[in-house]
Amino acid sequence: MADKIDISLYEKARIVVYGDIMLDRYWYGQASRISPEAPIPVVNVDQIEARPGGAANVALNVAALGASVELMGVVGDDQESRELETLLNKKSINCHFHRLNDHPTVTKLRVLGQNQQLLRLDFEKTLKHYEDKGLLQRYQHSLSHAQAVILSDYAKGALFNVTAPIQRAREKGLPVLVDPKSVDFSRYAGATLLTPNLKEFEAVVGHCRTDQELEFKARALIHQYRFEAILITRGKQGMMLIQKEGAAINLVAHAREVYDVTGAGDTVIAVMAASLAAGGDFYEAAQLANLAAGLVVRKLGAATVTVPELRRALHQITASHHGILSEKALLLAVADARAHGETIVMTNGCFDILHAGHVHYLEAAKAMGHRLIVAVNDDNSVRRLKGKDRPINSLQARMEVLTALRAIDWVVPFSEDTPARLITEVLPNILVKGGDYQPSQIAGGDEVVKNGGKVLTIPIKEGFSTSRLVEKMLN
């Protein structure tokens, strides 16, 4: 999973964060009685905390990954902005604030009883028609040593003229990632990547009844506004990555326990930016961002994720339960995975000579769930299907090659012409085959659907075919 990105390279990244800066206050206490004055809980406050919020929390997330970060935006000339700057300086974040006398620092006060949020108070005034040439010049200077830019738009006015920051960064060849709150995505035209949540995305395009509709509307926006990709975060459903080219990729959520989703989007865009700066592509970056989101929602409040936490989570995913299993052992492993709320994806094939098309297909299949099972035709089964000269590689050799791929969790052999019986035993959440199949043609598909599962296809990577490779070798 995302093994092509060396996350230790995060510390070499330099990222500029520009946007709506906020201060988050938290009052914690116990709510054990109802007020005699009104039917509301009385909170006995025993702890007060202040944290950076908005674009400042994005910068904090970037810094937690070890990257160098410059933060710029608008604040009030008040105690809140000075408190915020002190908090950020402690994390080695370089702040460039434009302070306004008649504008308060956006502050959000949350009151919690037994760690449950009871009330939020907002202290803010939205900027209208704001543009500061001095801040834009500072931004231009910062671009000269940056590898990526994050524009954190909370619709508070700091990015009223968002076109200029996008254009100046793109002129220097830098990726521009935008966390959008505006319902007018044309404002972000030319940006590299947008990271809306599902609610924000549907506020722009309308309700999407299916994943196909979601992908279609996202792709239309990509072409209309010259984006390279859109990453839609969907809470418990995970994420969907839609790029200019290729099929959309669904990434299943990793979180088993969710305590607080506050600031999870900030973590996602921070990891995306750091991963792109470290040389990753959108898919690899999204895998890591999805993993980070699963970690941060287990924490209370607007929290961050560190490289050691990411590394441990990656190790747990890649190290657990990989290998060739018997059918009996597979069923036990599947039962254990289901007990932990994991989504099971299954596919099958001969996989006689593994090629890049197979790897692309298997990675896309793994992205649909937590565990990927690959059922492999044994030698006699391949011979019946492909002819007496096949397979080229023995069953054991084929399975050993497959287990070397990190996308695959379990490999299991079967002897029949189709894996229908095995699929009926496993009953995966998602059954996958290549795009040259119709869902109605896929063995075992009917039973999976009856059990509430899905039968999906993945487009075939053009130019790759085992049969053509064999023919080429023979000739």
From Swiss-Prot:
It catalyses: D-glycero-beta-D-manno-heptose 7-phosphate + ATP = D-glycero-beta-D-manno-heptose 1,7-bisphosphate + ADP + H(+); D-glycero-beta-D-manno-heptose 1-phosphate + ATP + H(+) = ADP-D-glycero-beta-D-manno-heptose + diphosphate. In the N-terminal section; belongs to the carbohydrate kinase PfkB family. In the C-terminal section; belongs to the cytidylyltransferase family. This is Bifunctional protein HldE. Keywords: ATP-binding, Carbohydrate metabolism, Kinase, Multifunctional enzyme, Nucleotide-binding, Nucleotidyltransferase, Transferase. One of its GO terms (cellular component) is cytosol. InterPro entries: Bifunc_HldE, Carboh/pur_kinase_PfkB_CS, Cyt_trans-like, PfkB_dom, RfaE_dom_I, RfaE_dom_II, Ribokinase-like, Rossmann-like_a/b/a_fold. Pfam families: CTP_transf_like, PfkB. Homodimer. The active site is at residue 266. It is an enzyme of class 2 (transferase). PANTHER family: BIFUNCTIONAL PROTEIN HLDE. Signal peptide: none annotated. Pathway: Nucleotide-sugar biosynthesis; ADP-L-glycero-beta-D-manno-heptose biosynthesis; ADP-L-glycero-beta-D-manno-heptose from D-glycero-beta-D-manno-heptose 7-phosphate: step 1/4; Nucleotide-sugar biosynthesis; ADP-L-glycero-beta-D-manno-heptose biosynthesis; ADP-L-glycero-beta-D-manno-heptose from D-glycero-beta-D-manno-heptose 7-phosphate: step 3/4. Its EC number is 2.7.1.167, 2.7.7.70. Residues 346-475 are annotated as: Cytidylyltransferase. One of its GO terms (biological process) is ADP-L-glycero-beta-D-manno-heptose biosynthetic process. It comes from the Bacteria. Catalyzes the ADP transfer from ATP to D-glycero-beta-D-manno-heptose 1-phosphate, yielding ADP-D-glycero-beta-D-manno-heptose.
